[in-house]
């Protein structure tokens, strides 16, 4: 999509901010208290447990680059890409972006990808896949907490906040106005779904990766994120998936999910 995708160069050399965290467990929930310079994003934030224990999870604050500085060339490129993408509002691409405004539970996200396979993915047809993707989403939420800073704590403003009078998708924006834009959690979700389904059904890999990419790009179209937010989300998703492959529970669920999808595809072919 011209004006939305561009290659980010020369940013991986930045040092990520170190963020101290305090972790406790209450009623089976992971409770994270993150202390950021400039004030906390949230005093407390609860995340459902996924596959990875906190000590075994990624610590992306040690390697993920910060968002572009406001006076930097990468930020100028972000803004230009966003402004160009305003021409998509009112088109079929914007309608697709509106429909992509889902992130969980798995059954809500599945239809954005399952049409590529030509099967229905839900808790009746693919219970292990649905459970697996919900757990993966929890891992994604956990891993991004240390860097997902609120605007009041120095987090990056979202495009619709920077340009409130420009056209955007007919969605509810107010709740996200004070939350940080970087990195994009939806882009993480899209890339995880595309990557995992491509591994499960490799014959559809190209279309699934394209859908996962478009799912993240939709956040630019609707004004929730800049392109570098989306790129960072995909980077974190790829790293998280690599880490998950070292977890035996994830590998076991993935193997069972492959069987579920193989059965559905075989049934469809009859």
Tell where the protein language model's regions lie, with residue ranges.
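Bacterial N-terminal signal peptides that target proteins for export
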Residues: 18-28
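Bacterial N-terminal signal peptides
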Residues: 26-37
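Sec/Tat signal peptide C-region and signal peptidase I cleavage site
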Residues: 39-43
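Hydrophobic alpha-helical bundle signature of multipass membrane enzymes
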Residues: 45-221, 253
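Interfacial helix-loop-helix junctions of multi-pass membrane proteins
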Residues: 215-245
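Acidic, carboxylate-rich catalytic segments that either coordinate divalent cations
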Residues: 245-270
